[in-house]
């Protein structure tokens, strides 16, 4: 997910992926929670879903071989983590990019 350094933002250090691959064959990137802004929406968790594809592709570039996404047909109506959910209709295109 990342580390919390304040400012209601999570920071992801992709350099950790190759290190983890030295001790385990599988590294799964939590792409949607990584764009969360804990407490960043006035008392609830905010997020930046537009960065989910970039997070996934960056993780792939660093060697991740699995990806986790929270998806919803209408993310803004999601009961939890709405601000960082990937719209369901965007998932297929992203998965195809990750398969290349």
Describe the function of each predicted region.
Residues 1-71:
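Catalytic alpha/beta core domains of metabolic enzymes, predominantly
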Residues 74-100:
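C-terminal helical cap(s) of enzyme catalytic domains, especially alpha/beta-barrels
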